[in-house]
Each structure stands twice: as C-alpha cells, then as structure tokens.
Amino acid sequence: MSLSTLKNRRERGFFDGQFLIAMPGIEDRNFARTVIYICAHSDAGAMGFVINRPQSLTFTDVLLHLDMIKQEDQIVLPQRARDFPIQTGGPVESGRGFVLHSDDYSSDSSIPVSDDICLTATLDIVRAISKGDGPTRATMLLGYSSWGAGQLENEVVNNGWLTCPANEELIFDRSLDDKYERALAGMGVTAAMLSAEAGHA
C-alpha cells in the first residue's frame, strides 16, 4: 500500500490503529524486534511505520539538506526543534520524511490516521517545527513499511507478528531502546516468553 492509497481510502481496515510486534522468528533486519504502528489497512494492503528504530540523522541535518537553514543558523533554532526526534520508519522510500503527529496541527496535506493522530509528509510541517510552531507531539520517520494485498494477514496467521491496539504514549515516546519490551509488557508477555514458545513450536 502507498501513501496515495492512504489518502484515498474510504473505510478503516481490521489492522488500522494496531501495533504489530515482531515475533522472534522474524529475522529480516528491517523488522526484527520492531514495533510497527499500522496507519492504514484494506483489501489492497497495509502501510505503517516502525516506531522503535533510531536514525543517525538529526532534525538539523534534515533542515540543512532541504536548504531551509544555513550552517550558521542552527544555533538559533528553538531547543525543541534541535531535539526533534528522527527515526527509521521502514525500508520503502527511505529517503522521504513523514511526520506522525498529534491533531493539534493540521494543514491541507495532513491525513488523519486515527481520532488523535495525523500524518503529514510535506515541507509545511517541517517549517512549522523548525520555528517552534509545530504540533505538541510528533516524530519524523524516514521511510515506511508496506504490505501488498493479503500479505500482512498471511504473516499474522503464520505467527510473524503479535497485534494489539496502538498506544499513543508509546508512539511518541522518545526512549527507543526498550520500546519493544514495553510494547510486549502491555500485552502481558516478555521477549523471553516468546523465545521459549518459539523454541517449542
């Protein structure tokens, strides 16, 4: 599923607003030990963002790359902008930035993905954040994760993923190191329990 499909969707799918939590059997380095927030799911496929993978780029790097600021301007950026988190959202269009954010910011290009969360993938939100005028809660993700028709359903049936309702606090939490464990804890399980279960499968 692509961003254009997300824009044009009419109905919410079964996995919309869910977390996917990778089972130990997933060895693909793009998805091992990941937590993915599913933004859209339909008969055409699914789209979401990994929310626990750091990115080496900083928000200042992004602004410099986009020629929004000059090297000497970075010292006058609001502290909130300098600290703004950048993460790796997935392997598809990995050079493109997407901002998941609270619904207190909206532009013509913002797409609601839940009652409280929107997705914006245009420069207007980057400018707003750089000036300290952006949404209260947000994170920028480079790239996204995508599944074709029936692919995600098949992976879930084959025990590739655990699923549970998404938690907004976890989506925007900047502490990434233990986010996988905390997502599992929200379901009452641990990584050790999953590994033991996989060993007996």
From Swiss-Prot:
TM annotation in the entry: none
InterPro entries in UniProt: AlgH-like (IPR003774)
Domain of life: Bacteria
GO cellular component: cytosol
Family matches, as Pfam families: DUF179
Gene3D superfamilies: VC0467-like (3.40.1740.10)
NCBIfam families hit by this protein: PRK00228.1-4 (NF001268)
HAMAP family named in the record: UPF0301
Family stated for the protein in its record: Belongs to the UPF0301 (AlgH) family.
Protein name: UPF0301 protein Rleg2_0617
Organism: Rhizobium leguminosarum bv. trifolii (strain WSM2304)
